[in-house]
């Protein structure tokens, strides 16, 4: 599971600015998808080979927070689920009573806490940090989040407190088969669906806590295929599941999505598509995971209601045209068995392997059917393509002036590859690389022989 970093502090100390610094590497990934709603309260990031997840507790609790509700339920939940807490204070304003109150609360949590003094640009950092030593969290770390100064050093300090990336990845990799995360807002029927699936199985392992945060990895087998179900709802007995008391955890959901091969998004057909559903789907798309959308509680809807839901899916989720959509009833089991065939198809598409030769031929056929546009009178040239990764499939295309290729042509290429590779249920990502111009930055200097020849030609021209 990805390590979780919680940003804690009173309002206006720079939590959101630091959040943007720590997650900016992912901002551009979904910018081209119309209709996609993103939530800026939590998100994944990476520094070098160190992946992590950031939770902005200020955003979770509301920016108009007061000292009384600063440690409200959602903020406390984020702290409970975090591996490291970054306690932000304002170096310009100095130590306040609110800072001291937050420090007292954090000391009772038993969490790894780094004290971060923000807004140290333009002030004496040593002097600004001196009074914060009294909070008892060790040496403060100075940063200027607005300019990004000190952020890399801060993340190195965070990294030193956490297990190595290989250990984090090994925890998920030790679970067999296709890992499936069932996500959805409370009361959408996720728990009923999970219990329906497990109730049908004859080979079900004991529920084993996957992490200290109680996400559950449940191995089981169906039709000879091994699966591991990632349940984000915590440790619970199957006989005691009550959806009404199910708690929605953003952190557990994000971790489950990251650990999964395929995500099954459960929607409530009777309530339609909510803003929270769109946020979750945006996170899945951001992570590049294969996706099956299960529209639950389909039984009991009349034909007009079903048509309305289908129209709403097309209208509100145009960016999920690649995803498999299944209509089910978790309570009665209708359509549940068919989910696994679609999960397997999505998994196979996400982990497809394609040769460079085949991808280059597909690129050439795409250009024959619809050649790249002219840019400033010159045509963009695309030379060859190769695979750059799996889950999601990444296709790297090399050429000239690729950075000037319009988004419409990139979408055309994406659809062309998807259609000819028969990819179902997985997003596809294209990366464009422009070859270096060997003459860039060089002056066109004549050789001595060329200079002599030029002089002769000029003398000859003057005689005429």
Curated annotation (Swiss-Prot):
Matches recorded under InterPro entries: AAA+_ATPase, G_ENGA, GTP-bd, GTPase_Der, KH_dom-like, KH_dom-like_a/b, P-loop_NTPase, Small_GTP-bd
Ranges where the KH-like domain occurs: 352-436
One MF annotation (Gene Ontology) recorded for this entry: ribosome binding
Subunit structure: Associates with the 50S ribosomal subunit.
Domain EngA-type G as annotated: residue spans: 3-166, 178-351
Protein purpose: GTPase that plays an essential role in the late steps of ribosome biogenesis.
Residue sites binding GTP 1 per the record: 9-16, 56-60, 118-121
TM segment ranges: none
Coiled coil ranges: none
Family note: Belongs to the TRAFAC class TrmE-Era-EngA-EngB-Septin-like GTPase superfamily. EngA (Der) GTPase family.
Residue numbers binding GTP 2: 184-191, 231-235, 296-299
Annotated keywords: GTP-binding, Nucleotide-binding, Repeat, Ribosome biogenesis
Pfam families: KH_dom-like, MMR_HSR1
GO biological process, one term: ribosome biogenesis
Source organism (scientific name): Thioalkalivibrio sulfidiphilus (strain HL-EbGR7)
This protein's name: GTPase Der
């Amino acid at each position: 599971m990805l390590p979780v970093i919680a940003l804690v502090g009173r309002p206006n100390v720079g939590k959101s600015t630091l959040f943007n610094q720590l997650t900016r590497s992912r901002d551009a990934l979904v910018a081209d998808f119309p209709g996609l709603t993103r939530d800026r309260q939590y998100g994944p990031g990476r520094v070098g080979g160190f992946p992590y997840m950031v939770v902005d507790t200020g955003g979770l609790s509301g920016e108009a927070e007061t000292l009384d509700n600063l440690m409200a339920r959602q903020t406390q939940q984020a702290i409970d689920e975090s591996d490291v807490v970054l306690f932000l204070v304002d170096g310009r304003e100095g130590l306040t009573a609110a800072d001291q109150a937050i420090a007292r609360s954090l000391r009772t949590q038993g969490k790894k806490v780094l004290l971060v003094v923000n807004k140290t640009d333009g002030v004496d950092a040593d002097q600004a940090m001196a009074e914060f030593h009294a909070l008892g969290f060790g040496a403060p770390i100075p940063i200027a989040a607005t300019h990004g100064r000190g952020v890399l050093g801060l993340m190195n300090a965070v990294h030193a407190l956490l297990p190595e990336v290989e250990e984090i990845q090994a925890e998920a990799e030790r679970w067999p088969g296709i890992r499936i995360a069932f996500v959805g807002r409370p009361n959408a029927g996720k728990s009923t669906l999970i219990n329906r699936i497990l109730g049908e199985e004859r080979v079900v392992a004991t529920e084993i806590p996957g992490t200290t945060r109680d996400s559950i990895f449940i191995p089981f087998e169906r039709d000879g295929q091994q699966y591991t179900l990632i349940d984000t709802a915590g440790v619970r007995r199957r006989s005691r599941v009550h959806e009404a008391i199910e708690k929605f955890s953003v952190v557990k959901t994000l971790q489950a999505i990251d650990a999964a091969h395929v995500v099954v998004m459960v929607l409530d057909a009777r309530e339609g598509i909510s803003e929270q559903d769109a946020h979750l789907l945006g996170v899945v798309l951001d992570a590049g995971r294969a996706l099956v959308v299960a529209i639950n509680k389909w039984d009991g809807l009349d034909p007009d209601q079903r048509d309305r839901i289908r129209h709403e899916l097309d209208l509100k989720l145009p960016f999920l045209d690649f995803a498999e959509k299944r209509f089910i009833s978790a309570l009665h089991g209708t359509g549940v068995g068919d989910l696994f065939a679609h999960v397997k198809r999505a998994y196979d598409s996400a982990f497809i392997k394609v040769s460079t030769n085949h991808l280059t031929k597909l690129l050439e056929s795409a250009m024959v059917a619809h050649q790249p546009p002219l840019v400033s009178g010159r045509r963009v040239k695309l030379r060859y393509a190769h695979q750059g990764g799996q889950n999601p499939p990444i296709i790297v295309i090399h050429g000239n002036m690729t950075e000037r290729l319009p988004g419409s042509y990139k979408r055309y290429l994406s659809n062309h590859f998807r259609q000819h590779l028969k990819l179902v249920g997985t997003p596809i990502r294209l990366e464009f690389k422009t070859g270096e111009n060997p003459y860039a930055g060089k002056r066109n200097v004549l050789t001595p022989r060329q200079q002599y020849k030029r002089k002769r030609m000029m003398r000859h021209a003057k005689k005429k």
